[in-house]
């Protein structure tokens, strides 16, 4: 008997979705997935809630998610309140000492705790960290140092995360880390996520972005490339098909894959529940780049 409150097709669809997800849940149980959380998914409350629920569900079915986050819009908001003009060069925030103070305050003290609190409310048992905690990430100056306190990853110490993951916690990591002299640097969150994924021997690296994925034609969302081999991703950069802001994201994926990560995904964070759709469905919604077979 069908209840008047339920449509048979709706119930059938729910069963279909759960059935499709089952083999992926079984496959990834106990595996590590590093998620870079940023973009529109951090700004809009509905998307933020969907990401938190996705992460909590991943943890509840045995996946071990690790979250790395940025926080550009929030940083810009506080710089404006403090009358500090943000400056960008080559797509990177030029970071002097005053700006670095704000970056560290916002990412470590504000954004990180908002994410931790959101996950904890859903029972995900999140723990907030920065790259500096336990020397998790050691920074070095990016390029020739002309961008100030903008950093790159010198090395990663995954031992800090192992006991947390083994005990069922969800590490939430801000992309601020100190160099060997103890000076804090602002590191691109994609870069931190990629290097952590490699160090943790993660099954997947997932970058939440404000684009559908890698497009063959940047003006056409319909030209989304759903799956690539590592060599094909490199060729797209060489051919100029991947360009602009997508280049560092694709390069981040390539580096992680070259170090042993099984697959890297560039996913549209503007789509609610993008994480679950990419991980637990056959079609996915973004671009998956596969490592060496």
UniProtKB/Swiss-Prot annotation:
Enzyme class, UniProt record, top EC level: transferase
Residues that bind substrate: 71-72, 93, 186
Keywords (A to Z) from UniProt: Amino-acid biosynthesis, Arginine biosynthesis, ATP-binding, Cytoplasm, Kinase, Nucleotide-binding, Transferase
Catalytic activity: N-acetyl-L-glutamate + ATP = N-acetyl-L-glutamyl 5-phosphate + ADP
Main localization, broad class: cytoplasm
The enzyme's E.C. designation: 2.7.2.8
Record GO terms (molecular function): acetylglutamate kinase activity; ATP binding
Domain of life: Bacteria
GO cellular component, one term: cytoplasm
This protein's pathway: Amino-acid biosynthesis; L-arginine biosynthesis; N(2)-acetyl-L-ornithine from L-glutamate: step 2/4
GO biological process annotation, one example: L-arginine biosynthetic process
Residues carrying the site annotation Transition state stabilizer: 36, 249
Protein's cellular compartments: Cytoplasm
NCBIfam families, per database record: argB
Biological function: Catalyzes the ATP-dependent phosphorylation of N-acetyl-L-glutamate.
Family (UniProt): Belongs to the acetylglutamate kinase family. ArgB subfamily.
Protein name per Swiss-Prot or TrEMBL: Acetylglutamate kinase
Organism name: Synechococcus sp. (strain WH7803)
Gene that specifies this protein: argB
């Amino acid at each position: 008997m069908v209840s008047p409150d339920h449509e048979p097709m709706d119930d059938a669809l729910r069963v279909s979705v759960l059935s499709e997800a089952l083999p992926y849940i079984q496959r990834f149980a106990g595996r590590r997935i590093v998620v870079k959380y940023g973009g529109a998914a951090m700004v809009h409350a509905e998307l933020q809630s969907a990401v938190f629920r996705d992460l909590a569900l991943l943890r509840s079915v045995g996946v071990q998610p690790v979250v790395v986050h940025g926080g550009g819009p929030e940083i810009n908001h506080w710089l404006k309140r403090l009358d500090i003009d943000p400056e960008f060069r080559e797509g990177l925030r030029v970071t002097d000492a005053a700006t670095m103070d704000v970056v560290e305050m916002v990412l470590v003290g504000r954004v990180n705790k908002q994410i931790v609190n959101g996950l904890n409310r859903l029972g995900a048992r999140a723990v907030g960290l920065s790259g500096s905690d336990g020397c998790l990430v050691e920074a070095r100056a990016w390029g020739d140092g002309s961008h100030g306190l903008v950093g790159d990853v010198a090395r990663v110490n995954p031992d800090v995360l192992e006991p947390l993951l083994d005990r069922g916690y969800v590490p939430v990591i801000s992309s601020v880390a100190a160099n060997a002299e103890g000076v804090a640097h602002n590191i691109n969150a994609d870069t931190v996520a990629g290097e952590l994924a490699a160090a943790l021997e993660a099954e997947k690296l997932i970058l939440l972005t404000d684009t559908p994925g890698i497009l063959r034609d940047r003006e056409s969302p319909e030209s989304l490339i759903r799956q690539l081999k590592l060599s094909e991703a490199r060729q797209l950069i060489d051919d100029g098909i991947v360009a602009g802001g997508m280049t560092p994201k694709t390069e981040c994926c390539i580096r992680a894959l070259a170090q042993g990560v099984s697959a890297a995904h560039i996913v549209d964070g503007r789509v609610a529940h993008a994480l679950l759709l990419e991980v637990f469905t056959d079609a996915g919604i973004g671009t998956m780049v596969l490592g060496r077979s």
